[in-house]
Amino acid sequence: AKTVNCPAIDGILEEADDVSGDVEDKEVLDAALIASAQAVEHYEITRYGTLIAWAKQLGRSDCANVLAKNLKEEEATDRKLTEIAESKVNLQAAE
């Protein structure tokens, strides 16, 4: 398989790198990094949603099913990041 760069993800990662260089407070940095990770997750979620719709439209339920499993993993990761942020990291960053 050929590796393809994604300019959108590259931009999110570049932004995260810029923010991490600007933030000195460790707790604030942790919150910012979680926000960046969630930006990546949200992008991936939208892409999987689109790919699933296309696969279904093309009659490829086999592909749609595999993509749906990946989508569920991305959504679970996003929920975990939200839980971490809301239960601890954001509170510490606000202090």
Where are these regions (language model features)?
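Acidic (E/D-rich), amphipathic helical modules within compact regulatory domains
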Residues: 1-7
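Metal- and O2-centered redox machinery and metal/ROS homeostasis
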Residues: 2, 68-71, 77-78
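Short, solvent-exposed positions on alpha-helices
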Residues: 3, 61-65
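Acidic/histidine-rich alpha-helical segments that form the ligand environment
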Residues: 7-61
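Amphipathic alpha-helical coiled-coil segments
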Residues: 77-85
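Short, charged, intrinsically disordered terminal tails
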Residues: 89-95
